Amino acid sequence: MGSSKSKPKGPSQRRRSLEPPDSTHHGGFPASQTPNKTAAPDTHRTPSRSFGTVATEPKLFGDFNTSDTVTSPQRAGALAGGVTTFVALYDYESWIETDLSFKKGERLQIVNNTEGNWWLAHSVTTGQTGYIPSNYVAPSDSIQAEEWYFGKITRRESERLLLNPENPRGTFLVRESETTKGAYCLSVSDFDNAKGLNVKHYKIRKLDSGGFYITSRTQFSSLQQLVAYYSKHADGLCHRLTNVCPTSKPQTQGLAKDAWEIPRESLRLEVKLGQGCFGEVWMGTWNGTTRVAIKTLKPGTMSPEAFLQEAQVMKKLRHKKLVQLYAVVSEEPIYIVIEYMSKGSLLDFLKGEMGKYLRLPQLVDMAAQIASGMAYVERMNYVHRDLRAANILVGENLVCKVADFGLARLIEDNEYTARQGAKFPIKWTAPEAALYGRFTIKSDVWSFGILLTELTTKGRVPYPGMGNGEVLDRVERGYRMPCPPECPESLHDLMSQCWRRDPEERPTFEYLQAQLLPACVLEVAE
């Protein structure tokens, strides 16, 4: 779900053609320890045109590197070396009076960048001053200001973006190399009858003199010159560069600089997305401009005071694979405002029409994204308590994010707090948590193992044919679910590690994330 404004309805994208003039030619709520010289591209394994599926079974579970992936380029950081003039990478429409609106390409002087994710800036163009989201700008005349530079994104994330069937052959981006410090990688979409849509990666090496090259016979003084050259000549690449890879605007960190507790009147509920035991989820808008998802909780579900206290902690959890908490209405009925994810809950996505086309590599990629988000939760010493497919949200390009972290602890419903009632997710809950209320990150690991069965069975309810009481009794006596049909034994072995009786013997999420990456992530061409 990436947020987008209601004007326009879809997420804003940016794309710039590099064709030379003389050429001819593309929800959630309802529903590091471990246990135990011609350019030679490193081609992506054969995908089909549907969703960029990889046909060949991956080396371990998935032939993807999904460590800490992102849905938009990482661009601006803290000011360094006295640089105070930045350029806008996207249009930004201010949502409150203290913010500053600007257009893509506008030059901005940074007045103060000490307040985290929102900087005080002065527009050279309009003469106005206000707060801007720091991830919408980059230092002027820097590589970060180039549309084709995507910074520190992973190989797998570049493939997820480039394998969009709407991209023409030659769509490209430049990113940091994952394997060589100081080097870059040129990732280019290609197509042929044998492999279908695929991505090739070329390592861009740096000369001692400061220049760049893919092959030593053709060298350039800057990355900009390299891109301009290969936009006119393939010269050993799979195809000359045609279009910059499109990407959505990044999420701002919060709705605005000081928007946290907001009035109910500022929200408009438009389309109901789902309903559950404790409330509903709506697609809506904030301040008439900003597309958001809104969770409405039934009165009595939780104490407003306890919720507000927990929300103060939750809003500090920021990771690319966690759904962002934007704002709250803290008086009953409580409203929770989060980023809008266009494809809804993972459970509904798996059971729906799109789920039919998902193959193992994509399912494992989704699992790795979830593990990445949970590894961050683990590092922050937080506990989710209700990790399951219904609480994972899906956006464009199969991006998955963890939602509803921490809310389960606050629910005051007797049928839920008894941990035996119909509303309590027994089938996803570790035995020590279900029986004794011992919720830890290790009970989240157990739940992740159950979530893996949901992925591999396209949303089947765990322990089919068994009631909650029977599940609790049999699991306590040592029963574990067998390997699902068409699930590799290696993946079932990972599930089994998550279901070890002793919580301390279960793996960490850091370990799980690593196991869901390819056995070797080296990029031959890099």
Swiss-Prot record:
Disulphide bonds in the chain:
none
Broad enzyme group: transferase
Q: Which SUPFAM superfamilies match?
A: Protein kinase-like (PK-like), SH2 domain, SH3-domain
Keyword annotations: ATP-binding, Kinase, Lipoprotein, Myristate, Nucleotide-binding, Oncogene, Phosphoprotein, SH2 domain, SH3 domain, Transferase, Tyrosine-protein kinase
Q: Which residues form the SH2 domain?
A: 148-245
N-myristoyl glycine lipid attachment residues: G2
**What is this protein identified as?**
Tyrosine-protein kinase transforming protein Src
InterPro entries per record? Kinase-like_dom_sf, Non-receptor_tyrosine_kinases, Prot_kinase_dom, Protein_kinase_ATP_BS, Ser-Thr/Tyr_kinase_cat_dom, SH2, SH2_dom_sf, SH3-like_dom_sf
Could you cite one Gene Ontology molecular function of this protein?
A: non-membrane spanning protein tyrosine kinase activity
Q: Which residues form a coiled coil?
A: none
Which residues are named in the active-site annotation?
D386 (proton acceptor)
**Domain Protein kinase: where?**
267-517
What Enzyme Commission number does this protein have? 2.7.10.2
Q: Name the segments for region: Disordered.
A: 1-59
State where ATP binds: L273, G274, Q275, G276, C277, F278, G279, E280, V281, K295
Lineage summary: Viruses, Riboviria, Pararnavirae, Artverviricota, Revtraviricetes
Similarity field: Belongs to the protein kinase superfamily. Tyr protein kinase family. SRC subfamily.
Q: Where is the composition biased (Basic and acidic residues)?
A: 16-25
Spell out the Basic residues composition-biased ranges: 1-15
**Gene3D superfamilies, alphabetically?**
Phosphorylase Kinase, domain 1, SH2 domain, SH3 Domains, Transferase(Phosphotransferase) domain 1
Protein's gene: V-SRC
